[in-house]
Amino acid sequence: MYKRQGLINDPYLDESYRIDEGLRIARQLLIEINRQGLPAGSEFLDVISPQYIGDLISWGAIGARTTESQVHRELASGLSAPIGFKNGTDGNIKIATDAIQAAARGHHFLSVHKNGQVAIVQTQGNPDCHVILRGGKVPNYDEPSVNAACQDLTAAKLPPTLMIDCSHANSSKQHERQLVVTQEIAAQMSKGSRQIFGVMVESHIEGGAQKFTPGKDDVNALKYAQSITDACIGWADSEKVLETLSKAVEARRKK
């Protein structure tokens, strides 16, 4: 399984790293998605590419390994979209609450301007950041974990609401367990919990994942619409997840 950095970094999957072309392809893809009336979300891995695609992103995520990164917190402070910070890989939520507080403030730092020139950037702060529970040494999507996380948010004088990542450590990296996770989340919501406002699910058209090594494996031999990174649930299971969550939202509205 190829741990690639994404479409922008190596768009042709051949180690040519045509980042310039990757930016164009990614931007065109996002334009087409937006034209369909669909909001697009993205994880922000670096602090430069958002200048080229940020206007087409409605929601962004900062990963567990970069939530502590000062430059990513500065980036989040200037993005015109809600940003989710994941808890640490050990399950520590404090690094995420610290990140939210840091991103809510204005910052000054070196970055690039929309024309690609180096510039001194001043941000106003982003009041729309939140925590994403992705599990740690143990899963943290269950009701006691959600309650504990919301208590920590309240103690940090932040809104006690959050998003849950159904994959990664919450699914023990078993993609099909995402259905079990969403059922538990739906049960909490159906009882009236308003602490959970969203979920992340690793989903694709075809379930599972396929092995791929750039420079070794043939790109043309890849199976269409199946992940080459993390294993995902397929289209049919994705529909089940959406239906389960939809019913939970309806039940919550009646409480």
Stretches with model-predicted labels:
Residues 40-43, 83-85, 129-133, 160-165, ...:
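Hydrophobic faces of well-ordered beta-strands that scaffold small-molecule active sites
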Residues 163-240, 245-250:
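Catalytic-face loop-and-helix region of soluble metabolic enzyme cores
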Residues 10-26, 31, 57-83, 105-114:
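Acidic, His- and aromatic-enriched active-site or binding-groove loops in soluble protein domains
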Residues 30-48:
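Cap/lid and interdomain-hinge subdomains that line or gate substrate/regulatory clefts
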